[in-house]
């Protein structure tokens, strides 16, 4: 195994500890500390992940063309550390947005460089080890994420957000140091530009910043039903336009020669054909996988687990045995349940590699595309389980967390089939000089698009609930214009300046903001009684409602329908993939052994 691989693996372990630790507690932090509505929190977290997996496009170009992988990683890692620091020391929506923005730029910028750096350590002489190296790389991701996902919720619950965000920030600093120590161990693939890199970056940013600015403007001016979709289409269309104008108009004469040559290699000829072919597979099918998978990663699955109706006693079935009473009383935190995904990965990777794939190979040729197709069906099935859980919770029935763990088993099987396969597939299909870019433009951008779709759905499914008055006291009733089509257990969000305070956990007084549940429906008086979303207890409140300043909303996808929507969508995409995959022809690009430095 090449000597640089251990440094890459350790760096990835620490960086993923940081990213997944922070991501694991974001939804709980936003809903319980900042009092975001659940849909709003999902939108924010999805947009954060959108940025984290879109900015690899920028990092890949900077790496491939201007600075090379090492300088790009070290520079953007500092930006990453700054974002973590802002998040750990801040305390409101503004600092949250700034911290997440810097984190997205930093983690996104270094992501394609680190992962493709794995492949760069190999030649045609030892290419048979690439799959094993990528497995080690992926295992380091899941080991780091599993540890942080388990401990960060404990720190948030016991010590608050400063410690819970501060420890991952320290791990990111460690990741930067470890990567720096491996500098002399890496096989270095030089960037396209050997001179004038800073001038080239200036030209690059001159074209990029207007694209980002216009896309952000579109996001702000378009209504919530279509804003994410409109901004995404605008962003991708403008990027294509910039590339076209740069290659086919007089602008080509103003570009540095190395940048122009790189763009011609990336966007013309065989490379363009590869990108086009990969784009359909990744932007539609792999993107849908990530849309579903990321919701299990600290988002809607975690929010589901915050309900007290999910019994989170992991070993509760041992309660009748006196010797195991302490173990039976152990209760997981909602943000911790997702840790089983990483643990299942550690077990399933060797099982699939050495048992399941060989068995499958006796019946048919196990190709990357067939793995992906099977995985799409499998992950859709996991959402049927989660939908059933949500249906029980909505109707006030207790559900064991083991049902959600079962859903994670199914989801993790899909992840092994798709994620590792798609990562390796993207690298092997990419021409040599543009591997970082194609990794970003396919595998990582697919994650970004998947999260954009999640944000789009959660933004579009929110609908206003005209509210005339709110009666406060030991019970809180909201008088509405109409209670038609509302259900008991349905979520209802309060935002803006409601003028009302309520008593939360531990007797803390907070503004009436965030997600609540409809307890009872008084159809005769067109009013609903509010319950808190976690304990399902009556909301105790005081104050005078301000209808002109308050924002009261609910969701179009009620209860289990949210998860059934995604299950159906995933299943439909899986069926379509079966037909599309038959038209794709694979190629493999690796460095020739003769090109390896002495």
What is each model feature region?
Residues 1-49, 281-284, 291-303:
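Helix-loop boundary and gating motifs at the non-cytosolic
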Residues 65-77, 358-377, 433:
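Cytoplasmic membrane-interface "Motif A"-like loop-to-helix N-cap segments
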Residues 465-553:
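Small/polar beta-strand repeat architecture
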Residues 78-96, 377-396:
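C-terminal ends and interior cores of transmembrane alpha-helices
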Residues 109-124, 415-430:
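Intracellular juxtamembrane helix-capping segments at the cytosolic ends
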Residues 13, 94-110, 395-417:
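Hydrophobic core of transmembrane alpha-helices in multi-pass small-molecule transporters
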Residues 46-63, 146, 339-354:
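Central cavity-lining transmembrane alpha-helices of secondary-active solute carriers
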Residues 3, 124-125, 131, 153-331, ...:
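Intracellular loop-helix junctions on the cytosolic face of multi-pass helical membrane proteins
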């Amino acid at each position: 195994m090449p000597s640089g691989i251990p440094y890459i693996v350790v760096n990835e372990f620490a960086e993923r500890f940081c990213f997944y630790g922070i991501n694991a507690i974001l939804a709980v932090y936003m809903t319980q500390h900042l009092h975001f509505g659940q849909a709003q929190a999902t939108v924010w977290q999805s947009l954060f992940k959108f940025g984290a997996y879109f900015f690899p496009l920028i990092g890949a170009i900077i790496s491939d063309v201007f600075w090379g992988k090492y300088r790009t990683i070290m520079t953007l890692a500092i930006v990453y550390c700054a974002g973590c620091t802002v998040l750990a020391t801040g305390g409101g929506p503004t600092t949250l947005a700034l911290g997440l923005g810097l984190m997205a730029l930093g983690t996104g910028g270094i992501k394609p460089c680190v992962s493709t750096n794995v492949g760069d350590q190999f030649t045609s002489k030892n290419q048979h080890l690439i799959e094993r190296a990528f497995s080690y790389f992926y295992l380091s991701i899941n080991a780091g994420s599993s540890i942080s996902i388990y401990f960060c919720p404990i720190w948030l619950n016991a010590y608050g957000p400063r410690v819970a965000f501060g420890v991952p920030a320290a791990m990111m600093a460690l990741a930067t140091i470890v990567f720096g120590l491996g500098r002399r161990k890496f096989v270095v693939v030089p960037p396209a530009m050997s001179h004038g890199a800073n001038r080239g970056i200036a030209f690059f940013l001159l074209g990029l910043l207007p694209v980002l600015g216009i896309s952000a403007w579109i996001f702000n001016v378009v209504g919530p039903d279509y804003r994410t979709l409109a901004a995404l289409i605008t962003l991708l269309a403008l990027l294509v336009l910039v590339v076209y104008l740069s290659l086919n108009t007089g602008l080509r004469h103003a570009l540095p020669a190395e940048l122009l040559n790189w763009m011609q290699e990336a966007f013309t000829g065989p490379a363009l054909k590869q990108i086009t072919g990969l784009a359909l597979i990744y932007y539609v099918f792999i993107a849908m996988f990530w849309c579903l998978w990321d919701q299990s990663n600290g988002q809607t699955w975690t929010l589901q687990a915050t309900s007290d109706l999910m019994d989170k006693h992991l070993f509760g079935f041992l309660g009748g045995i006196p010797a195991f009473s302490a173990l039976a009383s152990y209760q997981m935190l909602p943000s911790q349940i997702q840790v089983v995904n990483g643990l299942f990965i550690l077990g399933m990777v060797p099982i699939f590699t050495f048992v399941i794939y060989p068995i499958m190979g006796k019946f048919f040729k196990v190709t990357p595309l067939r793995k992906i197709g099977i995985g799409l069906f499998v992950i859709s099935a996991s959402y049927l389980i989660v939908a059933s859980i949500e249906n029980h919770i909505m109707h006030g029935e207790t559900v064991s967390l083991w049902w959600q763990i079962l859903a994670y088993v199914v989801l993790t099987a899909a992840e092994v089939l798709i994620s590792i396969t798609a990562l390796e597939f993207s690298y092997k299909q990419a021409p040599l000089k543009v591997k970082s870019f194609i990794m970003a433009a396919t595998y990582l951008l697919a994650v970004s698009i998947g999260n954009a779709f999640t944000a789009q759905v959660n933004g579009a499914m929110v609908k206003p609930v005209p509210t005339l008055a709110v009666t406060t006291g030991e019970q809180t009733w909201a008088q509405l214009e109409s209670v038609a089509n509302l259900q008991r257990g349905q979520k209802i969000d309060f935002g803006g300046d409601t003028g009302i305070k309520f008593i939360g956990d531990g007797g803390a007084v907070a503004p009436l903001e965030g997600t609540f549940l409809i307890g009872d429906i008084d159809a005769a008086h067109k009013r609903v009684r509010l319950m808190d979303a976690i304990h399902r207890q009556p909301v105790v409140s005081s104050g005078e409602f301000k209808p002109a300043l308050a924002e009261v909303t609910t969701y179009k996808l009620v209860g289990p329908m949210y998860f059934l929507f995604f299950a159906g969508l995933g299943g439909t995409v899986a069926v379509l993939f079966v037909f599309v995959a038959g038209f794709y022809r694979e190629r493999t690009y690796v460095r020739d052994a003769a090109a390896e430095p002495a």
